Amino acid sequence: MDDLFALQGKVAIVTGAAQGIGREIAIGFSRYGADIVAVDLNEELLLGVKKEIETESRRCLALKVDLGSIDQINGMTETAVQEMGRIDILANIAGVNVHKPAEDMTEQEWDFVQDINLKSLFFCCQSVGRVMLKQGSGRIINMSSSFGIVGFGGRTAYASSKAAVSNLTKTLAIEWSAKGVNVNAIAPGPVWTPARDHLFSNPEFYNNLMTKLPIKRTAKPAEIVGPAIFLASEASSFMTGATLLVDGGWCAQ
């Protein structure tokens, strides 16, 4: 049964790998046998992730990449293939958020969220997908959100970008699955990451959030690793075009 989840011999690119969910997924993949291409803008934190992965006796290539640049995305893919020989898994975890009422959202803020959460994610899929299509195999895991399923006030740009990610995932699955490339998404509920410390440490915000969350707590980043390993492994071989809810019951209401 353990072989179903084994990632030995696989090479995984993980974006947003310096901290939070991306960091935990990169390290989690390495513990199940994968070599990692860890991608982020924060080079200092990225080198810490590289060091931890190498303690698992796995290879780790740390790449500082601005995902707002398609040229840098393509360079990421080329470097990964040159250094690692192939790409088996792409986990698109990088993302941003702007907390603001819809009537106050600026064009720059809207574009910032859409450019990272949707545009750059698509071009990562395209760039790495070309390699996977030539190989005849690959797994792509996109980061959606429960807010993209049911919406959430004050998160207009974020929620709409994540809804688009789920539909993009379906569309890519329709195009690529018959060619050996499965494409799925994960939609977490509220996850307490460093980027959300300022929100979740606010008692008023946190207590209000708990009234909407059946499990009555936020997730730890490590709790998203298991679903990611499932989607990266043979355990999910017949699964494609799906968005896997890992939301503490958020969307059950």
Residue ranges and their predicted role:
Residues 125, 161, 169:
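Active-site helix of classical SDR
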Residues 6-37:
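Canonical Rossmann dinucleotide-binding motif of NAD(H)/NADP(H)-dependent dehydrogenases/reductases
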Residues 130, 174-178, 237:
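Alpha-helical segment proximal to the catalytic Tyr-Lys
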Residues 101-102, 106-114, 209:
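Substrate-binding pocket helix/loop in short-chain dehydrogenase/reductase
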Residues 145:
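Residue(s) in the substrate-gating loop at a strand-loop-helix junction
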Residues 84, 137, 217-246, 251-252:
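C-terminal substrate-recognition "lid" of short-chain dehydrogenase/reductases
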Residues 2, 105, 151-159, 171, ...:
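Active-site loop-to-helix junction immediately N-terminal to the catalytic Tyr of the SDR YXXXK motif
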